[in-house]
Amino acid sequence: MSILYIDEIKDLREKLVFIRVDFNVPQDDNGNITEDTRIVGAVPTIKYAIENGAKVILASHLGRPKGEKKPKYTMAPAARRLSELLGKEVKQATDCFGPDVDAMVAALQPGDVLMLENVRFYPGEEKNDPDFACKLANGCEIYVNDAFAVSHRAHASVHAITKCIPVIAAGFLMKNEMTFFEKAMTRPVRPLAAILGGAKVSGKLEVLETLVGKVDIIIIGGGMAFTFLKARGLSVGKSLVEDDLIDTAKRILDNAAKRGIEFLLPEDCVVADRFAADADCKTVSVNDIPSEWMALDVGPASTARFSDALKEANTVIWNGPMGVFEMDRFAKGTFAIADVVAGLKNATTIIGGGDTDSAVRKAGVADKVSYISTGGGAFLELLEGKKLPGVEVLEQSGK
């Protein structure tokens, strides 16, 4: 892998630097940002650029405005939050290009920062339109991708734009993402354990197929576990099951067994009579799930067994919660695993995916894991062994 990083560029002074960030952060109904991890994550790259005298243009998307200018998806709240984090004004453009934007760019001084409006206000962004990309580039001399979480998309501000700007580089957030992933998957200190949770097998099918050939321990929790348990012949009541993937689950289990991989499924679970925070619930063996009840969390025997396996690991990757952690009564399994992972002092522990990130933060142990990836889909695609379009163009430019 040969990628040029921003700190390897000899001179940024007075250069017009376009930084693609990912400020696609959650907001409440009043437009207040409720979780700013991705903005915080981009600060080191932005600070480096302005401290070295660059004129910085930032671009991001927010939500899914579907190629239309919708006020609720404005980048203004993100620009305000970034101003607070940087301790300096971040100028806010009302568009992505055009005469007004040109005037703001022309007025930039070394160390200034200009935030463009939401790039997805234009259909050309998601179409990877080269004309739109070059309008965004707007005479910039250096392009920096610091948006790992969107680098699995061949979109104009991530992919096509690299043909419009002469120098192409990656930022520090991107560097961290790729470094930790390579450490975990390319040259891991073994045993290597993967924890996969979440609702459906279908969303992580390719990941599972790939991991069976790479890891030493696989732990399955969340709704997806019950497709595997049914594949093993158990009755799982009203629990979430993808019946069309039963044969696939059997094949994955067989492959894991042939390779000598420790493949752990829940032994017990917390079941409820309905999907609700105030439902009646109880803990039962996975062999005794009532026919009209559904499993919404893993039980204490499962977390104890998972914990024992994880204590043997030197590298851990976790994607997906163990249960419906948004409801307090079904969060114990997820939080228990979070505590175990956080307690692995001598292991490299990597958290990937929005729900897992939220769970680790809610459990209060975010500062005790090695790395929390900002990418959901991008992280999964790397686990699947896929090349990310946004990373591929960086590799090509770095050669």
Curated annotation (Swiss-Prot):
The keyword Transferase applies. It comes from the Bacteria. It is found in: Cytoplasm. It holds the Pfam family PGK. Pathway: Carbohydrate degradation; glycolysis; pyruvate from D-glyceraldehyde 3-phosphate: step 2/5. The keyword ATP-binding applies. It is an enzyme of class 2 (transferase). Keywords: ATP-binding, Cytoplasm, Glycolysis, Kinase, Nucleotide-binding, Transferase. It catalyses: (2R)-3-phosphoglycerate + ATP = (2R)-3-phospho-glyceroyl phosphate + ADP. Its EC number is 2.7.2.3. GO terms for cellular component: cytosol. ATP binds at K204, E326, G353, G354, D355, T356. One of its GO terms (molecular function) is ADP binding. Its main location: cytoplasm. InterPro entries: Phosphoglycerate_kinase, Phosphoglycerate_kinase_N, Phosphoglycerate_kinase_sf. One of its GO terms (biological process) is gluconeogenesis. Substrate binds at D22, F23, N24, R38, H61, L62, G63, R64, R120, R153. CDD domains: Phosphoglycerate_kinase. Belongs to the phosphoglycerate kinase family. Monomer. This is Phosphoglycerate kinase. It comes from Geotalea daltonii (strain DSM 22248 / JCM 15807 / FRC-32) (Geobacter daltonii).
